[in-house]
């Protein structure tokens, strides 16, 4: 075959593939007149017919659409289970997730979707979202500004689009007693943010990002949001060869300070949260992990203004366990919220899977209990269905499984507390500091001269066993 003929054949094949991909993004054939090229928000009837409100049926239930461990009104250690968790549905993963990936077209053709990105479609999607939360029994939701409303041709038009959708959300909230756990601005998808938002080398981009966060803060406040999150997916660098790190970090700090100032100006009493992540999409993000972020806040005088939103999958990407990140945040009094998800240990990227590991859930809940809960934060399911999960009921099953897993972890923590053996093991491990000299050291009065005298007096120390295997046995006994 000649080169020219081969080129024509390849182009034809490419066009056919593009057509096939596009076809998968169009309106599903089985919903007929409800789906038109000109999007309409006049959907009739339920979005999830045949699915009733999800109820607690106990551990013996074999019914997929029921809670086995999560009993919202049950009181455990002085709080209702729903108040320990304050569960939230993530709008973007749940209602904007398409199943598409770099190697394939979208796989999820939800019945209410019509293939457009119109305001009418955004309204229909919002209504489906609230019906989903009502049936799930979840009282909070989280959103990015650009996920709930489409971009316009100008910033003013985009803000007007957002206002229109927010009014609908406000109405739906008043009808359901559901409100945002947190809101945020999407500062990573649009090409203008390819070099970052608050760390962009272009001042016009910095100003645009500031305008977007200003609006998102105001919208979150208007909807009664309890928190506002900053996730800097592109606040970092690809190479240091073209990067002035000092200047970018200072710009980021000034941006966050401006957000603090605006929060106070509009009377927003919610908590500002920073969500650490080491990389992806940027090669190296500035908020690598909890410790790095805390150091940044200390350096720029922002402690007391921000807390941390720990995402478990981000923790593992940074080389830590979720438990480590939670404890680092907790002991520094900056634990504000948890994005409950997990990653796949066999891959090196952010897979955002629903957490179903009972052991991991128990460790997470041990930190939450020691923190006396997360309010005004909570647990947001920053997780998405697998690409191959395409049934509408899978949306419910995934959230039920995630909520049951966390509830089971919470019940396991009660077992550990009531048994007391693990806590006693830890106490005994440090009991040598429960002495006069130990108390002096912990009070910061252990000078080297005094300690040297003691070392000469005591001679070679006898070091006891760490009892790690026993600790693991005691922990496993509660699972």
UniProtKB/Swiss-Prot annotation:
Alphabetical list of PROSITE patterns matching this protein: XYLOSE_ISOMERASE
Temperature profile: Optimum temperature is 60 degrees Celsius.
Location of the active site: 144
InterPro entries registered for this protein in UniProt: Xyl_isomerase-like_sf, Xylose_isom_bac, Xylose_isomerase
Keywords, in A-Z order: Carbohydrate metabolism, Isomerase, Magnesium, Manganese, Metal-binding, Xylose metabolism
Subunit organization: Homodimer.
Name of this chain's protein: Xylose isomerase
The organism of origin for this protein: Hordeum vulgare
